[in-house]
Amino acid sequence: MGVRIMRKKALITGASRGIGAAAARMLAKTGYDLFLVCKSSEEEINIIKEETEETAGISCQTMLCDVSDPVQVELMAQKAGEVHILINNAAISHIGLMTDMSLKRWHQVIDTNLNSLFYICRLIVPQMVRRQSGKILNVSSVWGNVGASMEVAYSASKGGVNSFTRALAKELAPSDIQVNAVAFGVIDTDMNVGFSKEEMDELKKEIPADRIGSTQEAAEMICRILEAPSYFTGQVITMDGGWI
């Protein structure tokens, strides 16, 4: 009987579309098994499962999970099992005056974008510490670096992601676990659906690269960071076409 070689597994949240889906496809091509999570887009995430298993020959599990709910996250961690790479990508946005924002919506943004990192990492990190290896990549935003008018909750959540990344990296470096983040500028995802074509054209004029970034480029940056030497940790890398 042949010996089955255990492949490494990547857990990706917000994996049904956008940056998460692009990262899943790219990691599958490099031979990682996948555990893909999204809140409700079951059809979309199962398409990625079928595609990656067929084209890359890897194992891909999927699960619906609201990462803002610690009870659901516990079930997710149990089902995921061994995780070697964790990509915290799930996020929501809110555009509007801070004074018009409801308390419920504030908590939704903070719980999804920031608190979810704590809920997930507190369950996944112990196994990484036992193995003395692991990689955590948090998807952040330039608004976490400088803040954005009309996006106070989103900016605050991503600023928290940046600090969470730097602090956890110091905590886990002795266990040879890398923790990094990418602060993306404008990437071509569903987060832009609220903007008109005219608004997007004006936004592009502000970006020296004269365009918005693609999810493929975002995934390439994520994978390059995941391949970086183990001494590379605690970094928040900005990728924004020279914008901010």
Show which residues each predicted segment covers.
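Active-site helix of classical SDR
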Residues: C121, S157, T165
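Alpha-helical segment proximal to the catalytic Tyr-Lys
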Residues: P126, K170-P174
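Residue(s) in the substrate-gating loop at a strand-loop-helix junction
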Residues: S141
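Short, small/polar-rich loop/turn modules that mediate ligand/substrate recognition or access, typified
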Residues: A173, Q178, F232-G234
